[in-house]
Swiss-Prot record:
Family: Belongs to the class-II aminoacyl-tRNA synthetase family. Phe-tRNA synthetase alpha subunit type 2 subfamily.
Keyword list, A-Z: Aminoacyl-tRNA synthetase, ATP-binding, Cytoplasm, Ligase, Magnesium, Metal-binding, Nucleotide-binding, Protein biosynthesis
Cofactor(s) this protein requires: Mg(2+)
Organism: Pyrobaculum aerophilum (strain ATCC 51768 / DSM 7523 / JCM 9630 / CIP 104966 / NBRC 100827 / IM2)
UniProt name for this protein: Phenylalanine--tRNA ligase alpha subunit
Cell compartment(s), UniProt: Cytoplasm
Subunit (UniProt): Tetramer of two alpha and two beta subunits.
InterPro entries referenced in this protein's UniProt entry, alphabetically: aa-tRNA-synth_II (IPR006195), aa-tRNA-synth_II/BPL/LPL (IPR045864), Phe-tRNA-synth_IIc_asu (IPR004529), Phe_tRNA_ligase_alpha_bac/arc (IPR022917), Phenylalanyl-tRNA_Synthase (IPR002319)
Major place of residence: cytoplasm
Enzyme Commission code: 6.1.1.20
Cofactor remark: Binds 2 magnesium ions per tetramer.
PROSITE patterns noted in UniProt: AA_TRNA_LIGASE_II (PS50862)
Record GO terms (molecular function): ATP binding; magnesium ion binding; phenylalanine-tRNA ligase activity; tRNA binding
Keyword Zinc: no
Amino acid sequence: MLVLPLPLYEIIRHAPEWKPLEEVARELGSSVDSLMRYVEEGRAKGVLRVERKVIEFYELTEEGRQRAAEGLPEYKLLKSAVCREGRCTAHLSQHPEAQIALANLAKLGVKPRGNVVELDEETYKKIVAMLEEKQKALAAPHSAPPEVLKEFIKRKLVRKIEKTQVYVKAAVPLELVKPAEVKTVITSEDIATGRWRNYTLKPFDLNIEPPEYPAPVPHFFNEFLDYVREVMIGLGFEEVRGPVLEVEFWNFDALFQAQDHPAREVHDTFYVQWSGPLETPPEHLMESVGRVHEEKWRYKWDRKKALNPVLRTQTTATTIRALAERGDGEYKVFTIGRVFRPEKLDPKHSMEFHQLDGIVVGPGLTFKHLLGQLEEIAKALGMTKVKFRPAYFPFTSPSVEVYAQHPKLGWVEFGGAGIFRPEVTEPLGVKKSRVLAWGWGLDRIAMILLGIDDIRELFTKDLEKLKEYYARWARYKASVGAVGTLFTL
């Protein structure tokens, strides 16, 4: 005999034949959402048959409800007519919606004469009878004739609604199953007393989709990322994208980062066991990059190591791909994406965060151009207090760290920048141009601009906090961008 959770057993008991799940939920005093996971479990176990049907129905819009209660404009106009000696006359000046009424009466062949609508009494009664039927149809749109329903939809008096109805039916006789107390969690006391032996332990099925609950507001951090994208495109940059699962070549080697560099150890990089397909870098780039490593760093470059899969630690892996593909010239590209590092989670650090990476390529570019470009982007995002400090990065020279001021955390580093070294650009075929490059942590920038002092709050599930942070985001966006006002904390 199969042991089932009590809710699933009750569904089977109440649905010996096909029955809407809504009806079963009413009988059980429950809701469809709370029963859905048991329905999916029953389907997966083969004890419940499930069908989904899309049902169409029609409902009145707000204007439709008003017209159903007060009358259609054309109906009200003709009902106000006065009939004498076989002629019926309605005065347009008495009706504020006369133009709407006339537009719909014109489809019935009725035209005004001056400021009145005049019809012979027989025609008048015939048209009024038609409009009365239409008025009745508006009160019950589900039974309206197709051509009338089509008109109501066009006039935005009625809208079509599609709803997925779930039907269930028991797939096994009731006597072959029995209910039992099902546990998803057991305590140390359950184990010590042996009570766990009397429980049915429910396995977790990650393929079952949970019910969806609409968010009260858009997620502020997603809105922020989209806004950064708009800012960069507005400054003349083109967006490029790359994979999250990278080979070490693009993440490190192409950036002139030696294969024994500490950042390439397991405490700074997530290495991935992966047997699926991975894009191999072009052979000529592998050879030229390996040769530069051996000449400059003076070690034997390991081709096999360069092809190890890693979770990218920097979105520079994507911009360096774009540089290798496009070569010399004049262009500006950027990318926004997630990067991963084995960090300890605290208010300032996370093992998964977002970066804005960009490059500007062209002849004659200097360090002044770089600082000017960085300041332009920072101001476009509303950061009024920015400073630069000299820094070292393996793949840029000269290099700087970029800081912005947070009201509680003080000066917060959110990115690095520099000019790509010849050891980076020349193996990729870039020999006539200089390349300005930077990578910024967007999570920290969002914290600075929105006054958030803990990076974990960017992913909070607290609905009240989401509303609060969205309100801050709305105030921030209203203060920058097209308006031109800089946001100062």
